[in-house]
Amino acid sequence: MAAGIDDISIYIPQLYLDASDFAHARGLDPEKLERGLGIGQMAIVDTNQDPACLASNACLKVMQKNKLTPDQIGRLYVATESALDESKAMNSYVIGMLEQVYGDDTFGHCGGIECKFACVSGSYALYDNTNWIRAGEAEDKYALVVVSDIAKYDMGSSGEVTQGAGAVAMLLNDKPRLLTFDPKVTSTSIKNEYDFYRPFGKETPIVHGQYSNLLYLIQVKNALTDYKNKVKRTGLIKIKDDETILDHIDYLNMHLPYSN
């Protein structure tokens, strides 16, 4: 059975700080931000918005766009680094807000959790829900996977220029129009490091930027090597002696905190 992303909606707060204004306030070169890092504007939440609010708006957009009703949604996962509570999952807040639109208990049947693992938690949420669909448990229902964050850094820190806020809601089913995930081979790589983390009680992360960039490259290489070994073992791809795994890949979709 196929499984993947059928549609996507994005919600970004209406308030923003122009990157050139930020650069002048911090004594930075605006060209470095706009051309070097690809940053033109920094989204800012209003006083009545939080990550759950952003996620709810993204979900509402994708549901209304596809004319879906709550009974057609079987799962709702939220992936975030901006948790509101140490126990109560953010998806329950999102469901509560959606029920203000669709009615009390209209999402009472909807399973889900909050996922946390820095920037990769959304990928794991996608992985879990595509497997739920492939297993036949969805019963023709959709899964909603939402990534939502308010990224804040210490004032004057190197990470301050990459701040922002927003949410992306991905609608998953067994007949995806946008992207189908390969069910045969998945690879990952993990190591316990302290390049980017946010201890309990701290609103901003502790970041070692250059070290984090290096670790990212190492982990991507390790995951790609593991993927190559798996596809060779399963026979999914036949790699000749004068070829690399990249000769059999049309596109690479990478996570990057900045465009250059």
Can you name each region flagged by the protein language model?
Residues 85-96, 127, 151-153, 186-200:
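Active-site-adjacent elements of ketosynthase-type condensing enzymes
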Residues 1-48, 157-234, 238:
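Condensing-enzyme catalytic core mediating Claisen C-C bond formation in acyl metabolism
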Residues 48, 77-80, 107-124, 156-160, ...:
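Cysteine-centered functional microenvironments
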Residues 79, 143-149, 171-173, 255:
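Short beta-strand segments
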Residues 5-7, 33, 62, 73-76, ...:
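Buried hydrophobic positions in well-ordered alpha/beta secondary-structure cores of metabolic enzymes
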Residues 242-244, 254-255, 260:
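Hard-cation-handling environments
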Residues 58-74, 221-250:
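Phosphate/pyrophosphate-binding loops at sites that engage ATP/ADP/AMP, CoA/4′-phosphopantetheine
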Residues 31-50, 83-142, 148, 260:
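Conserved catalytic cysteine-centered active-site region
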